[in-house]
């Protein structure tokens, strides 16, 4: 009996250590980075943290190979720049054959969804994909059906929350409607999803309600005590619930009030704005996850919600056009190490996730401002050059390195460039303004990182990154080829 008791206690301890993930919780795995972790390392990290659902932004062959046999549920994706091609049914069938059917075997990849585009109706795209998205969606789902996969793999379109809104005269969730300029396309999409028993996918970002809007009530972006907004007797105490239910009302208005909804992206960045930091991210997730863990839902959908957190890792090669925070959505740093306590079980415990194992780093070398430099007239131009080719978003207002002095700013910029260039000695010259040191030059909360050894499987290679930023640099400098 004592042996049995010990076995039971040991089992309970193991289960307690591993944790039980919030039902239906997944993560977005983006790969827009100059130095990527090996895909197999990332897959193991997901498994170590009991994350069993992952949403991709493509169907990269190396990534898919790493996912094979893992048992993880996978949402593969067709990027926006391929939507026009997918309006051809033959091309759609070929894509399904190469990226879905190919992995449909025991020990293959457990593909459950195909994301057709990513936020294709964003206003910033100026309508580029409005008339391509529905034909692409229909062709992909029909190709899945023809391949005999339609019951287990569903096509969906991840949409930004700007596809719906409430009128300024009645800004409450119950008045939610799809945007007038895309109501026709949205009705087509929703009707088609309904016929194929597929969900609609929406990306909700409470952080963006705060960003650049000092009039937005800060607490309303979180889950812990905002002044409620009343909508016909329903109190909304946070923008996530209000946003989600605005979609529910929009769906109801076009005859699909019961359509399943996936939250394709939701998260909080940790750098690049005064509200983007680890403390705020902890507060946000510590409010969101316990709600999901109890299947609390929202006032109009008071049940289970399928959610994919955004994102898994920081991505230093993403565009910062939306804002400097765009490279810092990860719950893990670029090297797979956790940033802040987060309890994916929804139990509200203050514990760190398990980081990536056996990550290879470059040597302990930094590039710093040369205090003996004489000609400082070229300093500003060299800092601009370094930041064009690397990620200096931590230097921005409200960010972790915002308090550095002029020399510190130069050192940070030079070091980020040096690391992106794999610590090549020629990348720490800057017309005599920089020098290499083996002393860690981090200051306070401002970390001067050492880059990881880039995965040989990286599809977004440093050389391709350099080509892109070189073109940008020439354009910024007004130079001609």
From Swiss-Prot:
Membrane topology: Lipid-anchor; GPI-anchor
Keyword Cell membrane in record: yes
Cystines in this chain: 367-428
Top-tier EC class: hydrolase
Keyword Ion transport appears in the UniProt entry: no
Post-translational modification: Contains two additional disulfide bonds.
Positions annotated as propeptide: 456-481
Source taxon at top rank: Eukaryota
Catalytic residues (UniProt): 119 (proton donor), 265 (nucleophile)
Catalytic activity line of the entry: Hydrolysis of (1->3)-beta-D-glucosidic linkages in (1->3)-beta-D-glucans
Glycan attachment sites: 99, 110, 126, 131, 409, 440
SMART domains linked to this entry: X8
Annotated GO CC locations: apoplast; nucleus; plasma membrane; plasmodesma; side of membrane
GO BP terms, alphabetized: carbohydrate metabolic process; defense response; plant-type cell wall organization
Protein localization: Secreted, Cell wall; Cell membrane
Family according to the record: Belongs to the glycosyl hydrolase 17 family.
Protein name: Glucan endo-1,3-beta-glucosidase 8
């Amino acid at each position: 009996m004592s042996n049995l008791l010990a076995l039971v206690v040991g089992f309970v301890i193991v289960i307690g250590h591993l944790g039980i993930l919030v039902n239906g919780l997944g993560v977005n795995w983006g790969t827009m980075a100059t130095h990527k972790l090996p895909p197999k390392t990332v897959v193991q990290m997901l498994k170590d943290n009991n994350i069993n659902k992952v949403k991709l932004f493509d169907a990269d062959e190396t990534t898919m190979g790493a996912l094979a046999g893992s048992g993880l549920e996978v949402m593969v994706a067709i990027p926006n720049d391929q939507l026009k091609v997918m309006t051809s049914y033959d091309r759609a069938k070929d894509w399904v054959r190469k990226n879905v059917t190919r992995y449909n075997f025991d020990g293959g990849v457990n593909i459950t969804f195909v994301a057709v585009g990513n936020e294709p109706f964003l206003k910033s795209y100026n309508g580029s994909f409005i008339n391509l998205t529905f034909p692409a969606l229909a062709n992909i789902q029909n190709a899945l059906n023809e391949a005999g996969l339609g019951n287990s793999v569903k096509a969906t379109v991840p949409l930004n929350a700007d596809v719906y809104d409430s009128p300024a005269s009645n800004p409450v969730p119950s008045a939610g409607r799809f945007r007038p300029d895309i109501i026709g396309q949205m009705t087509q999409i929703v009707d088609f999803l309904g016929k194929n028993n597929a969900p609609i996918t929406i990306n909700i970002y409470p952080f963006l309600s705060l960003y650049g809007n000092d009039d937005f009530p800060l607490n309303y972006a979180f889950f812990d005590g905002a002044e409620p907004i009343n909508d016909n007797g329903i109190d909304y105490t946070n923008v996530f619930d209000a946003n989600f239910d605005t979609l529910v009302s929009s769906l109801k208005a076009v005859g699909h009030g019961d359509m399943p909804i996936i939250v394709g992206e939701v998260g909080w960045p940790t750098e690049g704005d005064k509200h983007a930091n680890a403390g705020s991210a902890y507060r946000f997730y510590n409010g969101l996850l316990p709600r999901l863990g109890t299947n609390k839902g929202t006032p109009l959908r008071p049940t289970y919600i399928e959610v994919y957190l955004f994102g898994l890792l920081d991505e230093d090669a993403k565009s910062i056009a939306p804002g400097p925070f765009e490279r810092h959505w990860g719950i893990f740093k670029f090297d797979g190490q956790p940033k802040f306590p987060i309890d994916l079980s929804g139990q509200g415990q203050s514990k760190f996730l398990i980081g990536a194992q056996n990550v290879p780093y470059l040597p302990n070398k930094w590039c710093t401002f040369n205090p003996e430099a004489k000609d400082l007239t070229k300093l500003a131009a060299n800092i601009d050059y370094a930041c064009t080719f690397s990620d200096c978003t931590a230097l921005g207002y409200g960010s972790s390195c915002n308090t550095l002095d002029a020399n510190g700013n130069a050192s940070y910029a030079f070091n980020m460039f040096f690391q992106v260039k794999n610590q090549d000695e020629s990348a720490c010259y800057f017309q005599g303004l920089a020098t290499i040191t083996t002393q860690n030059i981090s200051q306070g909360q401002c970390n001067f990182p050492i880059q990881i050894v880039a995965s040989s499987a990286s599809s977004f290679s440093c050389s391709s990154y350099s080509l892109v930023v070189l073109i940008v640099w020439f354009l910024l400098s007004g130079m001609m080829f």
